[in-house]
Swiss-Prot record:
It comes from the Eukaryota. Midgut and brain. It comes from Rhyparobia maderae. This is Tachykinin-related peptide 2. Keywords: Amidation, Cleavage on pair of basic residues, Neuropeptide, Secreted. The keyword Secreted applies. One of its GO terms (biological process) is neuropeptide signaling pathway. Myoactive peptide. Increases the amplitude and frequency of spontaneous contractions and tonus of hindgut muscle. The modification Arginine amide is found at residue 17.
Length: 17
C-alpha cells in the first residue's frame, strides 16, 4: 500500500508535501 511507502506515492499524498 502507498500508505507504507509515502516516497513512492505522488507528491502531496500522505505527509509528502
Amino acid at each position: 500500500a502507498p500508505e507504507e511507502s509515502p516516497k513512492r506515492a505522488p507528491s502531496g499524498f500522505l505527509g509528502v508535501r
